[in-house]
Amino acid sequence: MSAPIVHGGGITEAAARYGGRPEDWLDLSTGINPCPVALPAVPERAWHRLPDRQTVDDARSAAADYYRTNGVLPLPVPGTQSVIQLLPRLAPANRHVAIFGPTYGEYARVLEAAGFAVDRVADADALTAEHGLVIVVNPNNPTGRALAPAELLAIAARQKASGGLLLVDEAFGDLEPQLSVAGHASGQGNLIVFRSFGKFFGLAGLRLGFVVATEPVLASFADWLGPWAVSGPALTISKALMQGDTKAIAAGILERRAGLDAALDGAGLNRIGGTGLFVLVEHPRAALLQERLCEAHILTRKFDYAPTWLRVGLAPDAAGDRRLADALARMEL
């Protein structure tokens, strides 16, 4: 098995290395809404009992409306990482996997560990009939690159002709619903869409995601995960929040993103990509920049495969923006 990937987060470890209390650090290392929404009331029975069929069906129905799946009832899963781990069972055997990259590293790690030949490709021109599974994160993490639905559906059609699959990870898609292909999964036949619940709502600890695909694919994932894969409280919370008005959540995220942009621009940093939930910065001394920010007890995300890149997430408030701006202003790199 390959070595684990170092992801965002890890405030406790950072504090142990650079000092300070974890609660005093400013965590800008993730792509998670830093202003979690207020939790709806969860009935005691959701904690006391195993989730029943009605609870699951209600959450799936709410997800179908929220993700505009055109009749498909999305499968709730305990975080999309849980189904990434299952992809070696789904990917056509003895064929290559193509991953549009650079992107979220767990796809390549899991599939290569299972013995698949993984080709990292820049665009659809690199795809061949050898690719049994094509993976696109859209919008992409960490670059923010976005493919239009027409481009993705063209790839899906090409894959279908060669007996292959297309997986589109829309983990950061809540703020850009016009990019989603979730509504095409039932008609396309070979299209699978992953959606993340926790990033937009600021509830990553809930460990909840959804899969949109044909019924046979959903049945396979459900069988591999086993019964009661998602907790009753998670299902109850997701139903309530997806049925609520999310406009204020989106507006709050965009306001926080504007504050981050201002702090980075004020320091003269080069923004080269991102989504509503993070910015990708290019700097010739990105590793040193990350180190200096850690010394100021501000955590960001660097990338071993791209030493000039730094991903910066959103601060929870204007005070966090000022703290970042002040730390950058004091730096000599």
UniProtKB/Swiss-Prot annotation:
For this UniProt entry, the molecular function terms from Gene Ontology, in alphabetical order, are: pyridoxal phosphate binding; threonine-phosphate decarboxylase activity
**Matching Pfam families:** Aminotran_1_2
Catalytic activity entry: O-phospho-L-threonine + H(+) = (R)-1-aminopropan-2-yl phosphate + CO2
Question: Which keywords fit this entry according to its UniProt record?
Answer: Cobalamin biosynthesis, Cytoplasm, Lyase, Pyridoxal phosphate
Pathway assigned to this chain's UniProt record: Cofactor biosynthesis; adenosylcobalamin biosynthesis
Entry's InterPro entries?
A: Aminotransferase_I/II_large, CobD, NHTrfase_class1_PyrdxlP-BS, PyrdxlP-dep_Trfase, PyrdxlP-dep_Trfase_major, PyrdxlP-dep_Trfase_small
The Gene Ontology biological process terms listed for this entry are: cobalamin biosynthetic process
Q: What class of enzyme is it?
A: lyase
Concerning Gene3D superfamilies, the annotation shows: Aspartate Aminotransferase, domain 1 (3.90.1150.10), Type I PLP-dependent aspartate aminotransferase-like (Major domain) (3.40.640.10)
Summarize subunit and interaction data from the UniProt record for this chain: Homodimer.
Q: To which protein family does this belong?
A: Belongs to the class-I pyridoxal-phosphate-dependent aminotransferase family.
Protein name, please? Threonine-phosphate decarboxylase
Say which species the protein is native to.
Sinorhizobium sp
Q: Which gene encodes it?
A: cobC
